[in-house]
């Protein structure tokens, strides 16, 4: 059973969002899944601590970061937007399905919204499992499913001021554009 909890820290929210009703964190204590959408920098140490278990033989942590160029174009930043109620539901299902499929001990998925500067993380994924094989496979699978299914969109903002909106699924694991 998942629960959605609005967090109370004063995020840098766009003015049309009410921080008291904006659902940013969903947890399932039974399956040890934790989903967060935030305008704050992501905390990998916190992600690992949420899934830490004495039964774990492996913890895998992935951080997706904003790099300074894409296809020889200098990037200024990435900007993310989402439909939070549906994105939280989708990300929760991805995490819960991964726990069942890979016999995981826990999953954290955190995604930044708003502007993400060069060098900062836009996504954190942490998985915990009894053995490394399951953890490695699950971590990559969770990432690819997040990019494929989550209702989160990014705008690549280039140094020249131009930008391109993209669904995360527009690129493959090597970062190449997927032709529709």
Curated annotation (Swiss-Prot):
Report the domain of life of the source organism: Eukaryota
What are the boundaries of the region Disordered?
1-31
The main location class comes to: cytoplasm
First-tier enzyme category under EC: transferase
Output one GO MF annotation.
Answer: molybdopterin synthase activity
Here the segments flagged for biased composition (Low complexity) are: 21-31
Q: Where in the cell does this protein reside?
A: Cytoplasm
Identify one Gene Ontology CC term for this UniProt entry. molybdopterin synthase complex
Subunit: Heterotetramer; composed of 2 small (MOCS2A) and 2 large (MOCS2B) subunits.
* Descriptive protein name: Molybdopterin synthase catalytic subunit
Which organism does this sequence originate in? Aspergillus niger (strain ATCC MYA-4892 / CBS 513.88 / FGSC A1513)
Taxonomic classification: Eukaryota, Fungi, Dikarya, Ascomycota, Pezizomycotina
């Amino acid at each position: 059973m998942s629960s959605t909890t609005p967090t109370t820290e004063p995020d840098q929210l766009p003015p049309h969002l009410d921080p008291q009703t904006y659902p940013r964190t969903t947890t399932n204590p039974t399956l040890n899944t934790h989903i967060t959408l935030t305008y704050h920098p992501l905390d990998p140490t916190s992600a690992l601590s949420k899934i830490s278990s004495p039964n774990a033989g492996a913890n895998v942590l992935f951080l997706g970061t904003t790099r300074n160029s894409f296809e020889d174009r200098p990037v200024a930043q990435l900007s993310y937007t989402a439909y939070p109620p549906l994105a939280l539901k989708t990300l929760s299902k991805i995490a819960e399905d991964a726990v069942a499929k890979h016999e995981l001990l826990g999953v954290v998925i955190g995604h930044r919204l708003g502007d993400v500067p060069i060098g900062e993380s836009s996504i954190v994924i942490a998985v915990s499992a009894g053995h490394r094989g399951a953890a490695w496979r699950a971590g990559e699978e969770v990432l690819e499913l997040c990019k494929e299914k989550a209702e989160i969109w990014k705008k690549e903002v280039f140094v020249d001021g131009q930008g391109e909106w993209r669904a995360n699924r527009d690129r493959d694991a090597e970062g190449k554009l997927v032709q529709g």
